[in-house]
Swiss-Prot record:
Its cofactor is Mg(2+); Mn(2+). PROSITE patterns: PPM_1, PPM_2. Binds 2 magnesium or manganese ions per subunit. Disruption phenotype: Approximately 15 percent of mutants have an overextension of the axon of ALM neurons which terminates with a small hook. Approximately 30 percent of mutants have an overextension of the axon of PLM neurons. Approximately 10 percent of mutants lack synaptic branch extension in PLM neurons. GO terms for biological process: negative regulation of ERK1 and ERK2 cascade; negative regulation of stress-activated MAPK cascade. This is Protein phosphatase ppm-1.A. Expressed in neurons of the nerve ring and motor neurons of the ventral nerve cord.
Amino acid sequence: MTISRADLQIASSAEPKTHGNLNESFAPEIRQTASTIASLSIFGTPSDQECQPIPVVPRSSSSDELRVWRVTSAGLVEVDAKTMGAFLDKPKTDKTNVHGEGNGIRYGMSSMQGWRICMEDSHIAEAIMSQSSPYKDWSFFAVFDGHAGHHIANRASSQLLEHLISSEEFREMTKTLEENNGVLTDSTLKLLEKGIKKGFLSFDEISKTSNDISKSGCTAVCAIVTPTHFIIGNLGDSRAVVAGKNEIFGTEDHKPYLEKERKRIEGAGGSVMIQRINGSLAVSRAFGDYEYKDDPRLPADQQLVSPEPDVYIRERNLENDQFMVVACDGIYDVMTNEELAEFVKDRLSVHSDLREVCDDVLDECLVKGSRDNMTMVVVCFPAAPEVNIHRKEAEEAWVSRVKTVINQFLDEAVAAEDFKQEEDMVTLKSILDKVTANGLLPTDLRVPEHTVTTLAQKILTQRDIKHV
């Protein structure tokens, strides 16, 4: 039995004591798993080399904790679990926003670090893709969700578009469009599809030589919007969703357990364990992750992790298409495509500023339990829902009343004789209870679940009051 070069994560406990969901009955099974893997040949087959036990390289630790091991060429190496998908004590809810318009569309973007110890997302939002023809009439939007570092995601946001436009297929397509007044035909659409795939592969190959990439990887979803078509490239588990009046379209995630992905992974000498590649990586296609792409016998699109995207081409329907969302999996972890589309439609009836629509989505996902970085771009087309002025005014009046109740409650709390600003904390639950007691939970308004919590957090931060 063989193991690919891609690292395999194994959880093990320092002692058979309770660590969250890890208990005495489960710890022996984990140790047995580690023992079994230690007897395997790392590279090659038994005929290539004799199977020898893998040496264990421990990391010193004096405390009871969840411990993580990786199978490497040096043996079972214990690594610092704090740097692997670790979370903050409190989420960082500050947001980065951009917005713009052009070519008959509007867009807004919001990103938030959330519970993660660092921000690894990046994005592109260009209402005008380029100043040259035909791209001056096209738009380009993309989101890159990094893992094990932000390096490849940041590089993708600054260089991927250039790789697409400079591909041989895009140049040939450009020449053809100049000759036929920019009309996308079947042949030019095929060139677009090939150009996107080659551009992704080219970017990934060139990035391999960069010194700052380290072991980071990222998913990618990009959307080109032309006057007549959507052309979407997807790599990994970020997603694009196009919402119309009567239908919703969404890209398909690349997960190791899907049949077509599993076949490639197993063909490259890997396996799918706990729905991950070799028990470690949760996506089957990505930029970077070069330790999963080191078999010299295989082309890039047949490695354990492939950098080749799926490309979707859809004709636009100007009367039906309302908006498109391009977002990372921090959104889709807690919302289905349909739930997200319905939520965005609802918020568009209240907000004319698309940044506020995106902010509401991120805050709602946080309340629903998303623990990941979150980045979202919403692109509105001519048929998008318009603001309902009566709904907008009613919600604004309700928000004003809630703010008044929260501030009055905090005034009373801070004025208490035993309250010490530097030591005592106000709980969000106590604020929510106060709002409920005042009969302010909305019944006739479709206000998002997160609204009271978000308002309370903002007021507490503005007043510099500690809270939990």
